[in-house]
């Protein structure tokens, strides 16, 4: 098999990164690839954003989906277990060879039979056994050949002696025979003469005979002609008669045929009639049979139906009895619970009364102690005040003297301190300056010494390097004609090898394409994967491989329009030691054979040393490239003398599917070429360089195949290269290609030629610094002498105040037991319905049968003519007699030659056969996959980010093997496996380990020491070392399959078994049925368990968040202990601004509802408030919490893993949270999101969103029940006027989450100015939809659905909706109501009023209304309204519907005015049948109608 490099969509990268050709793919590792294990690749770092596909899993960290398996891995695994060739095993045959040689020398016929194939030994034991068999066989063959050879030698000697004796006797007999033979020859000549005369006479007679014979033949021919004439006439008449007879016969036969046809048709028709009759009869009989069967089945079905109905009826009656009994028992239990509850609450009330008495006694004791404390405290304060006055007088005198002394001392001190500060300032400045001088001197000295040391080290290094450089140049000169050396030795002064962090800029006038945009443009050119033209579809695959790499700038070059690509921020490049900071490439398309020749795609790399890709779409392309370098000052640099490498210039290495004769070349180089001795690249006209013929295949004349020279590590990579010497500031050359598809060229200073030294740059010696001199300090000032300060007075201590008594802790009364919940009764079962009987089928009718038709009679036969008599032929004349040839005299009998005596039969040459035996060995290999603990994880699951190790094992090499010259293992790693090169090297001693990033392939080559171990004793088996690949699996829901290839001595290759491991998160995984997306869920539910995601949630409601910890896909997981110790967590990032957590209600259960232990929950106010361990945990999982959060954690990760993770048991966390009451006053949306963290990997739930409605109750003042009437807020209400407080409740929006349990109006009115009349009305503010589907229209009177509580003493009215009514309202319906409280103004002044609307126990305050009542001009005597009799507050009163006459209905838009101070005699109806509001007409009418007594006025 030839080494073939397939061009397939990804260009190999070279460490040299030099200008190179169009081969795109990494060479596939195959058995025949011998020592070529991977194409040359370099790792590059890109800062560009790359779009990646994700798994669909809600992962927070590592969300990328596993990429497609590399082509190398795909083909390797497709051939898993396959073997190519084997290693020969040699067994000595020396004795056999000597026996064969001796036999040949003795004349024995030696036949070498076909070599006996002993097969392939796959183990050392098998090999040893087969070698023993071969050795035994060789010994046996040698012995048999020796025996045969010796026997044959003896037989040959005896035969030779007998042969010599017989030869002498035979010679004497032969001499006598020669004499007799001469006499015989003389007699023969005499007889021959007589016979010649007799022959002449015979020939004359023969001539006469032939003449007579001709005459007779002529007569016979004339007779024959006459006969033929008569025969012709006969045949004519015969033909006429035969024709007439034939026509008569034909007419007869036609009549017979027609008769037969008619009769056959009649027979067919009769047969059809017979068949139809039979079919009709059979159909009838079958129908009758079916009828009878259907009739029986229907009867049977009707019987079964009746039996089934009876059975269901019996079961219904049984179930009905059970349900009725169960409901009766439930009612009995409920009644018992109510009785017990009443008894408990009676006891609690008695105990609460005792507590109240104890609290009152404790309060009385406390009040007495407080009174005594206050008297004692007053006496102490008086004594302390006298003491304080005396102390203050003494203190004043002291402070006056102290002030004088302190001022004098302060003045002196200030003068001195100023002098000191001035002195300090001056000296500080001098010291600072001196310190700076000292520092500058020290820095200068240190800098100088460092530079001097560096200079000396650099100088020594330079001298050493210069000596090596000189020697290298001399060596290059001496070897310039040898393969791989420059034909003109040069040194390299340019360092331009790698700039991964360069900043690439392209002028904004040049359009940079996006991936999809460029893809669409190229497809519009006909380059498409669906194009039936294979050349164009193949060209698209090449283009797409480059276009999918987003680190390149995607450009379209237009003919003769230059495009500049500038790179700045260069860090690693220099020329003759001078730094290069910028490089500018100018690309100009000169020509192309593609389409109209005006455009071509190009891709500019982010690294200027990697440079660019361009396309030719299997046509031709020529691009001019100009290069300019700039120094740190921005000046153009002249790099004359620098060397650049033009390498990997392939020819004949194109796509076999299109045209292999692809050519890559450099043209119009404005520098000077320096050929490499032995290179295939030659200089041509126009200063171009390329190969004259194929340099890809030996069979086409190349010195090596491509795979033997076109790799980074190949010592022959100079074979496809030439070196360019720069001769001017602007470098210019053309990159040209033909039929290459994609071409990558890299412009840099890596040189493929051997022995090109880098010229060292001599260091510059540093200049010794000039040191500064330090300045002297100023002298210090003299300190002053100070006056002593006076002694301060001593204050007598105050008397301590008496201890204040502590207020006692009062006992809290116990709450009453809640009433028992009424039972929910089972519905009685539905009685069964009997299925109607099936009707009987219709009976079939017997058919009418057809009659058959008679046949036609046969026709009469014709009479024929007789045929004529044929003519008689006359016999021929007889021919004359032929003369007889004479009898000649016989020749005499010659003498008998003597019969020589038979020589003795020579001994039969024996034939000996021998054969050799062939034996091959195939060392077997095995791939194992393990976790970090060394546990086999093949065909199992492990967590994402787990360390996974691949062990590449080879069994012992067998005895008798050839010398091992190479032992190479190649492992194309699975996509998404993060390879750890350092750890792999550490785990793979005995091997040189290399990694090809482009193909994601690791190669292990046995070191020389390892090979020496293998070859120490070839006669014995030897155990092999095995390398281990170490890395991590990075993707969710990924399957990692892997095998490797072993190649020994470039001859034997074997591909291992395929191992597989899967990470959780893969739906429809055929290998792991439990595997699916790792998808934690979060659902908000109410207390009934209904999903309330997205619904309106009232303040004070409890959200029962249900968090699913999704673990089922981990079933069978075999993650390592290290992965398990990363822990298992669940994070709830709740909105603390809206919710309060309820840790007392948190529950954790498994899928079956069993409570789970070993999971703790911790709440943190913020990420910053959490421990660093928690912060690191969330950071690693890439989880960002917004504020407060809860963290659920497994206390013991290992136990948690065993019990739940490895068993695939998902958990359900119920995490209740209550909506803060204050949030209802502002309203708004709140969001909640949670995260699951397994093995350190995070997965997010969906965001749960709810909204809290803003409850905004409103209060108006009206004189009627008309909602459109004027609001008197801020206006005047007359004394004794009757009016209404309109209490408009908050709006509960539709689609709310919780049933309404409480909706109340609490009006704490000012009883000093207002008097509640005891009358109120409550109406629906909007349409209400009930659970049963009925609708209550807006404006409907709902007073009967409320209860009212009145506290006249404190001026409080509470109107509350009945709970059973509220719970009938559908959750999908909005709700709002308003209540009118009828009031009477009973005092003069301004009065303010606010009411509270409570919704599910949360209070919301309304606006405040203000009304003013002036002093009336002519006040009437008021008629007091009796205060309603206080009711039991525990038994709120339900207002009764008043019975009123039916007065004329007034227009509600024009309310009837109320007379001030005068009572009305009637109260109009407050509503019509359609629930339209009606105005109240006045207090007196209301009093008269309701029959209310006078109430005691509240006092101010």
From Swiss-Prot:
Binding residues annotated for Ca(2+) 1, in chain numbering: 648, 650, 664
Binding site for Ca(2+) 4: 1308-1309, 1311, 1354-1355
Positions occupied by motif LPXTG sorting signal: 1467-1471
Location relative to the cell: Secreted, Cell wall
Sites of the Isoaspartyl lysine isopeptide (Lys-Asn) crosslink: 927-1042, 1082-1232, 1259-1393
Role description: May bind sialic acid residues of salivary agglutinin (SAG) in a calcium-dependent reaction. The interaction of SAG with its receptor in various oral streptococci modulate bacterial colonization of oral tissue and is associated with reduced levels of dental caries.
Protein name, as recorded: Agglutinin receptor
Gene name of the encoded protein: sspB
């Amino acid at each position: 098999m030839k080494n073939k490099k397939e061009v397939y969509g990804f260009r190999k990268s070279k460490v040299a990164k030099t200008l190179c050709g169009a081969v795109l793919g990494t060479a596939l590792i195959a058995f025949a690839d011998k020592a070529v294990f991977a194409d040359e690749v370099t790792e590059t770092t890109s800062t560009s954003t790359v779009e990646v596909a994700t798994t669909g899993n809600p992962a927070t960290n590592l969300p990328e989906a596993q990429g497609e398996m590399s082509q190398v891995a795909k083909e390797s695994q497709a051939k898993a277990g396959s073997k190519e060739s084997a290693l020969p095993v040699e067994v000595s045959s020396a004795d056999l060879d000597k026996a064969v040689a001796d036999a040949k020398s003795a004349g024995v016929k030696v036949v070498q039979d076909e070599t006996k194939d002993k097969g392939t030994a796959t183990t050392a034991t098998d090999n040893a056994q087969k070698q023993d068999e071969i050795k035994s066989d060789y010994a046996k063959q040698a012995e048999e050949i020796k025996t045969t050879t010796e026997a044959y030698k003896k037989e040959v000697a005896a035969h030779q002696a007998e042969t010599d004796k017989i030869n002498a006797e035979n010679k004497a007999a032969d001499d006598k025979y020669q004499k007799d033979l001469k006499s015989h020859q003389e007699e023969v000549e005499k007889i021959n003469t007589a016979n010649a005369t007799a022959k002449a006479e015979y020939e004359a007679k023969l001539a006469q005979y032939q003449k007579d014979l001709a005459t007779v033949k002529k007569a016979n021919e004339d007779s024959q002609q006459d006969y033929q004439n008569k025969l012709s006439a006969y045949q004519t008449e015969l033909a006429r008669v035969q024709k007439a007879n034939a026509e008569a016969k034909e007419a007869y036969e036609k009549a017979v045929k027609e008769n037969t046809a008619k009769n056959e048709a009649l027979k067919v028709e009769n047969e059809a009639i017979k068949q139809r009759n039979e079919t009709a009869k059979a159909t009838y009989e079958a129908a009758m049979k079916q009828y009878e069967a259907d009739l029986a089945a229907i009867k049977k079905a009707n019987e079964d139906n009746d039996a089934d109905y009876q059975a269901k009826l019996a079961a219904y009656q049984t179930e009905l009895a059970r349900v009725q009994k169960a409901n009766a028992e439930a009612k009995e239990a409920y009644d018992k619970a109510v009785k017990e509850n009443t008894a408990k609450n009676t006891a609690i009330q008695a105990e609460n009364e005792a507590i109240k008495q104890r609290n009152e006694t404790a309060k009385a004791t406390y009040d007495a102690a407080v009174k005594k404390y206050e008297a004692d405290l007053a006496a102490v304060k008086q004594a302390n005040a006298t003491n304080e006055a005396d102390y203050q007088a003494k203190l004043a005198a002291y402070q006056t003297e102290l002030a004088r002394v302190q001022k004098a001392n302060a003045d002196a001190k200030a003068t001195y301190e100023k002098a000191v500060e001035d002195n300090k300032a001056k000296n500080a400045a001098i010291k600072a300056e001196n310190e700076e001088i000292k520092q500058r001197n020290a820095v200068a000295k240190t800098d100088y010494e460092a530079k001097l040391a560096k200079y000396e080290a650099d100088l020594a290094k330079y001298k050493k390097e210069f000596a090596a450089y000189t020697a290298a140049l001399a060596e290059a000169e001496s070897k310039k004609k040898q393969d791989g050396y420059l034909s003109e030795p040069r040194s390299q002064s340019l360092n331009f090898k790698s700039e991964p962090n360069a900043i690439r800029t392209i002028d904004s006038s040049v359009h940079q394409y996006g991936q999809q945009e460029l893809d669409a443009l190229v497809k519009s050119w006909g380059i498409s994967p669906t194009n039936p033209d294979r050349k164009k579809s193949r060209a698209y695959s090449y283009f797409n491989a480059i276009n999918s790499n987003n680190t390149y700038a995607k450009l379209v070059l237009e003919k003769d329009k230059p495009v500049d690509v500038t790179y700045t921020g260069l860090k690693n490049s220099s020329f003759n030691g001078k730094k290069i900071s910028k490089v500018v490439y100018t690309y100009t398309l000169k020509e192309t054979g593609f389409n109209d020749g005006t455009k071509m795609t190009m891709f500019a790399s982010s690294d200027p040393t990697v440079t660019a890709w361009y396309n030719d779409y299997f046509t031709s392309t020529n691009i001019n490239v100009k290069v300019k370098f700039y120094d740190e000052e921005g000046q153009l640099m002249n790099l004359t003398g620098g060397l650049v490498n033009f390498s990997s210039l392939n020819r004949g290495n194109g796509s076999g599917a299109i045209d292999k004769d692809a050519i890559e070349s450099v043209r119009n180089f404005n520098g000077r070429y320096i050929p490499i001795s032995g290179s295939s690249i030659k200089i041509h006209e126009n200063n171009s360089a390329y190969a004259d013929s194929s340099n890809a295949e030996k069979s086409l004349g190349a010195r090596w195949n491509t795979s033997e020279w076109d790799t980074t590590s190949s010592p022959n990579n100079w074979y496809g290269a030439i070196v360019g010497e720069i001769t001017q500031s602007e470098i210019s050359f053309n990159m040209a290609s033909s039929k290459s598809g994609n071409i990558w060229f890299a412009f840099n200073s890596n040189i493929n030629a051997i022995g090109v030294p880098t010229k060292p740059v001599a260091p510059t010696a540093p200049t010794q610094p000039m040191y500064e001199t330090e300045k002297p300090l100023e002298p210090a000032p003299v300190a002053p002498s100070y006056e002593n300060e006076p002694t301060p007075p001593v204050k007598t201590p105050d008397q301590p105040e008496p201890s204040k008594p502590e207020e006692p802790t009062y006992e809290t009364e116990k709450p009453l037991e809640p009433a028992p919940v009424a039972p929910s009764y089972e519905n009685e079962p539905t009685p069964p319905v009997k299925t109607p009987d099936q009707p009987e089928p219709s009976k079939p009718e017997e058919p009418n049968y057809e009659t058959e038709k008679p046949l036609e009679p046969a026709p009469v036969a014709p009479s024929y003519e007789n045929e004529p008599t044929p003519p008689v032929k006359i016999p021929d004349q007889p021919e004359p007699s032929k003369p007889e040839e004479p009898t000649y005299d016989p020749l005499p009998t010659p003498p008998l030659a003597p019969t020589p005596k038979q020589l003795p039969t020579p001994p039969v040459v024996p034939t000996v056969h021998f054969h050799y035996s062939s034996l091959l060995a195939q060392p077997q290999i095995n791939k194992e996959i393990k976790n970090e603990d060394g546990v086999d994880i093949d065909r199992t699951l492990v967590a994402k980010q787990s360390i996974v190790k691949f062990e590449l094992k080879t069994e012992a090499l067998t005895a008798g093997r050839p010398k091992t010259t190479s032992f190479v293992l190649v492992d194309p790693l699975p996509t998404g496996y993060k390879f750890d090169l350092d750890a792999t090297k550490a785990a793979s001693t005995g091997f040189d380990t290399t990694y090809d990033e482009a193909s994601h392939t690791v190669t292990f080559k046995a070191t020389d020491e390892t090979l020496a171990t293998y070859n120490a004793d070839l006669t014995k088996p030897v155990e092999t070392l095995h390398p281990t690949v170490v890395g991590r699996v990075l993707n969710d829901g990924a399957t990692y399959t892997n095998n490797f290839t072993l190649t020994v001595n470039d001859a034997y290759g074997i591909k291992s078994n395929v191992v597989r491991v899967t990470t959780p998160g893969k739906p429809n995984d055929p290998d792991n049925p439990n595997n699916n997306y790792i998808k934690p869920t979060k659902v908000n539910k109410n207390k009934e368990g209904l999903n309330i995601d997205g619904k309106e949630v009232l303040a004070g409601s409890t959200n029962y968040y249900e968090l699913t910890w999704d673990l089922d896909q981990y079933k069978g997981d075999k993650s390592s202990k290290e992965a398990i110790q990363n822990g298992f967590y669940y994070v709830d990032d709740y909105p603390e601004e809206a919710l309060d957590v309820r840790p007392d209600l948190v529950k954790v259960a498994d899928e079956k509802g069993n409570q789970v232990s070993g999971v703790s929950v911790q709440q943190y106010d913020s990420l910053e408030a959490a421990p660093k361990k928690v912060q690191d945990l969330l950071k690693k999982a890439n989880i960002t919490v917004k504020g407060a959060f809860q963290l659920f954690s497994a206390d013991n990760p290992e136990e948690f893993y065993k019990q739940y993770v490895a068993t695939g048991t998902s958990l359900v966390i119920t995490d209740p949270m209550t909506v803060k009451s204050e949030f209802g006053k502002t309203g708004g949306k709140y969001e909640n999101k949670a995260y699951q963290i397994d093995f350190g990997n995070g997965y997010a739930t969906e965001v749960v969103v709810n909204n809290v409605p803003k409850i905004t109750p409103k209060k108006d003042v009206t004189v009627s029940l008309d909602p459109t009437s004027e609001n008197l807020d801020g206006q005047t209400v007359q004394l004794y006027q009757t009016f209404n407080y309109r209490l408009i409740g908050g709006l509960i929006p539709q689609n709310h989450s919780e049933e309404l349990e409480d909706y109340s109006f609490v009006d704490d009115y000012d009883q000093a100015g207002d008097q509640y009349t005891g009358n109120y009305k409550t109406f629906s503010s909007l349409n209400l939809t009930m659970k049963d589907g009925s609708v209550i229209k807006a404006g409907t009177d709902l007073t009967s659905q409320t209860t009212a509580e009145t506290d006249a003493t404190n001026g409080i009215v509470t109107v509350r909706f009945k709970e059973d009514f509220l719970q009938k309202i559908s959750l999908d319906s909005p709700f709002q109501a308003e209540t009118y409280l009828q009031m009477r103004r009973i005092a003069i002044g301004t009065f303010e009023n606010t009411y509270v609307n409570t919704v599910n126990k949360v209070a919301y305050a309304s606006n405040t209304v203000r009304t003013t009542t002036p002093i009336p001009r002519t006040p009437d005597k008021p008629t007091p309204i009796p205060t309603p009799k206080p009711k039991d507050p525990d038994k709120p009163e339900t207002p009764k519907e008043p019975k009123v006459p039916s007065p004329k209905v007034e227009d509600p838009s024009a309310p009837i005015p109320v007379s001030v101070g005068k009572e009305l005699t009637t109260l109009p109806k407050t509503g019509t049948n359609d629930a339209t509001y009606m105005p109240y007409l006045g207090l007196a009418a209301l009093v008269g109608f309701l029959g209310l007594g006078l109430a005691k006025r509240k006092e101010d």
